[in-house]
Amino acid sequence: MASLIDIKQRITSTRKTSQITKAMQMVSAAKLGRAESNARSYEPYVSKIKDVVTHVASTGNSNDHPMLVSRPVHRTGYIVLTSDTGLAGSYNSSVIKEVFQEINKKHTSSDEYAIITVGRSARDFFKARQMNVVLEVQGITDHPIFAEIKDIASNTVQMFEDGVYDEVFIYYNHHINSISSELRKEQLLPLTEFHEKGKEADVDLTTYEFEPSEQEILEVLLPQYVESLIFGALLDAKAAEHAARMTAMRSATDNASDLISDLSLQYNRARQAAITQEITEIVGGAAALE
């Protein structure tokens, strides 16, 4: 059995750790509230620009834009959203595992894919395995602004337009609530949903006159729309990250409390045993003197 001093030291260190995890839980809870607000406030913008793109692309005169039409796939781009730090449960590992398995199943050569990482966790994982990471960004703040990922977003769109990629997917954790999230895989490019809508004969849309032409409008709108999807996914993922870290720290705090209770019980038992032993020795010594 451990000595009283050892048990007391473990109780002290566990209590200090519990105070740290409790503080981290409270910080994550505060960050989560703001992250949820950011994600919600951005949704109307994405929805509106999607409506505009739908109207323009569904006119029948411009739905053959290169960003709308599927083409033979020779190279796939993967955007992977993770965090720079850990202590967030399975937040990072679930996304990384899904992308890793998808690449191994779908591709036989590094020439067939390219990985774009947001967050140090994904970058370190894929680079450690000599996988093809072509773009990366770290240091995303807890409450991101578009400027932080503008280069990656615009480069992704440009490389698709230049034929470097034939399709682009984004992987991230979608925030549901404070205790749950789900892994999402979404196709960013090509935007085939708009191309298919343009082919539908029963599309009921208000008639608009476009100035300049639909094609010129799409040249500006489509890249902006894809970039908005990437930023929207980042805001969503950040909310999921803070929720995951809050949950992980709450679990750590609860586990620390349970451990302190167990150690306190051990301490009391050891102390009781020591006292009993001392009494026994005193009684035995007194009896020997009689």
UniProtKB/Swiss-Prot annotation:
GO terms for molecular function: ATP binding; proton-transporting ATP synthase activity, rotational mechanism. InterPro entries: ATP_synth_F1_ATPase_gsu, ATP_synth_F1_gsu, ATP_synth_F1_gsu_CS. It holds the Pfam family ATP-synt. SUPFAM superfamilies: ATP synthase (F1-ATPase), gamma subunit. Keywords: ATP synthesis, Cell membrane, CF(1), Hydrogen ion transport, Ion transport, Membrane, Transport. It comes from the Bacteria. One of its GO terms (cellular component) is plasma membrane. The keyword Cell membrane applies. Coiled coil: none annotated. GO terms for biological process: proton motive force-driven plasma membrane ATP synthesis. Transmembrane segments: none annotated. CDD domains: F1-ATPase_gamma. PROSITE patterns: ATPASE_GAMMA. F-type ATPases have 2 components, CF(1) - the catalytic core - and CF(0) - the membrane proton channel. CF(1) has five subunits: alpha(3), beta(3), gamma(1), delta(1), epsilon(1). CF(0) has three main subunits: a, b and c. HAMAP family: ATP_synth_gamma_bact. This is ATP synthase gamma chain. The lineage of its organism: Bacteria, Bacillati, Bacillota, Bacilli, Bacillales. The gene is atpG.
